[in-house]
Amino acid sequence: LIEELEVSPSSILAITFTKNATNEMLDRLIVSADNTGQYEEIITSKSLHKIEKEQIRYLQQKKYKWIDSLTVRTFHSFCYSILRNYGVNEFDNKFKIIGDEKRDEEDDLSKNVAPETVFEVIHKLLIEQCEDISYLLQLKRYILDYIIDKVHLNKTDNKFIPRDGKYYTSLDGTKVRSKSEQFIADWLYRHSIKFVYEPLLNVKDFYFRPDFFIPDANLYIEHVTDKSYSMANKEEQFHLGNLLLVKTFENMTNDSALFNHTLDSILKNRLPSNYFKTISLNFKEEFNGYHENVKDFVTQIMRITDMIKVENIEIDNVLSDARKDQHERVRNFYELAIPLVKKYIEYCTNKSYLDFNDLISRSTSLFKNHEDIANKYKHKYKYILVDEFQDVNNLQVELIKLLLTDQSQLFCVGDDWQSIYGFRGSNVNYIVDFENHFPNANVVKLNLNYRSTDNIVGASNEVIKNNKNKVEKEVYSSKKSEHKIVVFAGSSEEENIQFCFE
């Protein structure tokens, strides 16, 4: 463009995904301009520290004016500069960047980083949300059921069948055999009533284990289901020992209000009145021993927050759709998640924080609402290059389209085979269906692989051809090899790691 068509370097925008990719692009440009070959030796040197290379790269970039006039940025860095210059029309232009981790890079984004990470904020908000006892107990029940016990997998995966038949964990950590018994144990726990689960009892003739014993009421509870053994012999033993036995029945559990009332009636006149005060619960005590599981939950909140922003979905619509899901686990998760997502967004707005998705969404919003600002960028950048296009998401494509005019030239490089970030919101359809998203486009397929051997490329062809959503192409290798591919499937993660190590 610059050499043959004499295009002004300042009219070229090159967008990448990572800082490393940006540096690599700049390095290639500088190497192409450096006739001495010294710069290539510098960037490949193992004796120079990363910071030293950054400093040399900066000086070399300034040395070549045409390179310095180019705009080579990540999506986030590009949007950061837009919002710093014009963000007052959309948000607080003194915003700080909040990310998944603390940044130590020497770039614009790192200079204005928030003092806390996304994880730290959501974790803090989760603790605050758990001041609502109802929420705290729902969260603990979710973690116990679906992260600890994995009850949604018990019926289909033998790996999760416990030897003692006790699938379910109650709020106090007691393992029980059914959801109904879990309900009873949880009810007792919430009302600060001590209990013993399946105590070993011998009244006269034989040993047996009633379901629950309430010491302070000297009362036994048997929960009867269609899977229960006959109660006749047990009831006779209770009668002989003059012991108090109360039975609950499975059909009562169909109505939680009725079951609550039943348990209340059973114990109402058998315990002091102060037993019916709700137990004092707090986050630290309830989740002691479950810290890693809470971290997993927070990580899931971070993920769906990203997806909501990338897909630009109304938060309330997410919850209403989730409530219709056929799976209880999904319904329960979103009931817990959406209040936190809302609080996180409110918190960040109040603190003038923008996360990486916000940088792009706020920039697109700025362009849509302020045509004069959008036109400045449209007129400046006539030539736009996007690298790793297979990883773009909806927000990023929307931003690109807002930069285009009839005179713009868009050049995208990508490989649908390398699309691995769908879990983060990337949409491979943009490269597979490129001509529909960008009409009048010319698609060039590069089918010669210079990196891998023919055995690897051949196997890849065989695997990828099963993909439904792909660019039709046959890839060939420039390298021959006599080494065959070795397939190893270990029985555990540790075994797989050991194989790779050896």
What role is predicted for each listed range?
Residues 209-236, 240, 323-327, 417:
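Short beta-strand-loop-alpha-helix junction that forms the active-site gateway
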Residues 499-502:
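Conserved helicase/translocase motor-coupling segment
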Residues 225-270:
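Catalytic cores of nucleic-acid endonucleases
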Residues 13-16, 21-22, 26, 71, ...:
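Conserved helicase NTPase motor core
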Residues 1, 394-493:
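Conserved RecA-like helicase ATPase core segment
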Residues 63-71, 86-158, 253-336, 443-445, ...:
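ATP-hydrolysis module of ASCE/P-loop NTPase motor domains
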